[in-house]
Amino acid sequence: MKFARFEINGWQSYAVVEGDQLRVIQGDLFGQHHFTDARYPINSVKILPPTQPTSYWAIGLNYADHVAHQIENLDAERIAKDAQAFMPWQKGVSCIIGQGDTVILPAESDYVHYEGELVIVIGKPARRITPEEAPSFILGYTCGNDISSEGSWHDDPSNWRKKTSDTFGPVGPWIETDLDPQSVDIITRVNGKETDKGSTSGMTFGCYETVSRISQFVTLHPGDLILTGAPGAVEALQPGDIVDVEIPEIGCLSNVVAAE
């Protein structure tokens, strides 16, 4: 089942995706809710980011192919060392944008690239859970684009600019609840040309392991998001580009790129 968050005429709600229609949900998606008879064509509404998370986590260097690409292009010694450890970090929730929104390239940045990823959507509070318990705490999955600037900002002591600048967190278009995350393709396209494709089967730390490890020290709340890593190579984005992140079982997240 696919759940979308949308806005029409200033009113926001959740809905279940039924073909090219949205069937409105009344109540709390993460609690008690029911389906109504109200429907809207998808093309008549604004699709919003699928949740409003309290935290937006990310796992870096989670695929061997991506590690190899980064070693080739960045600080090889540091990348090789970091890739051996589980190193989650937080992407600022203020950078989140949704389907069709614009990625803005900061005037000060000199190299901004995409990172198409699978995103975990937490469904209920999770604290000190095991990998085996993790599926029951996950509502579903969506597409994400971990927009990053690795140019002159690469050596920043934190990710505050290179990972969490405004608009650097596209996510959507909706949540798929019926998905086995262990072997799905992640496809990234720029201006219609495929630039990266990989499978979640190549993850070093799988989705259930990731949720479990983070929950040992941090309570995850309903609607929280976790980026699970880019599977392969990345390329620079330019003003006017259209970047798509597609996971066939979920849908396609599409955003246009513009200069500040």
PLM feature segments, named:
Residues 1-86, 179, 189, 193-194, ...:
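N-terminal non-catalytic cap/leader segment that marks the start of a structured domain
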Residues 46-50, 66, 148-260:
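Catalytic-pocket segment enriched in acidic/His residues
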Residues 52, 58, 98, 113-115, ...:
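Residue-level recognition of short, solvent-exposed, well-ordered loop/turn junctions
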Residues 55-57, 86-88, 94-95, 102, ...:
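Structural motif
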